[in-house]
C-alpha cells in the first residue's frame, strides 16, 4: 500500500481534501449499495439547533445497529457525516471477504502478525486457538501484517471464535485513503485519552478562550 501526501484544500467548518459539495456528489450514488434506505434531518428533535441527520440501514448484519447519526456545523456537513457513518458501518462488515484460519503460534516467526495478547485481552484468555486473520498494512514499517479479524470487522460472524468483543474503534472514512487513515488514527488517540480520563477520574483543565467564530456560535447553542 502506497501512501501519498494529501493536502487539506477545504478548511471552513471542517478540514478535508475536497469541498463538501464534491464529497456529497461522490457518496450519494453509493447510498443504495451500502444498504442505506433513508437519510433524514432530525435537528428539530431537540432545542439546541446544531444540524443532525439520521441514517437508516436495515440490512446491517446480526449484532450491528441499524441507525446512525451525523452532525456538523452546517446542514450539508451533517448530512455527509450521517451518510459516511452508514458507509463506514457497511464497510466494516465482512461480506464476502476471505479470512485465513490459523493460530498465532503457527504464524509467529514465519510472517509478520499482530499478537492477540497485545490487543488487551481478558486475563483468562487462553492461547493456541484457531482464529480468523486478514492482511493489514504496518504503516510504521511499510509492510503487510496479519491482523486478527476480530480487530478489523464489526460485527464478526458468530461462527468464528470470539476472543473479545468487536467494535468500531478506529473506523473512519475519507475522500482519500490518506484522509481516512488520518481520521481513524485520530479516533484511536481520542478513545485512548477518554479511557485514561475514566481510569484516572481526571478530565484535565477546561478548554476556554475559543476564538473561532463558528465554534463560538455553536457553543452558545
Region annotations inferred by a language model:
Residues 1-221:
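Helix-coil modules at protein/domain termini and other flexible surface or pore-lining loops
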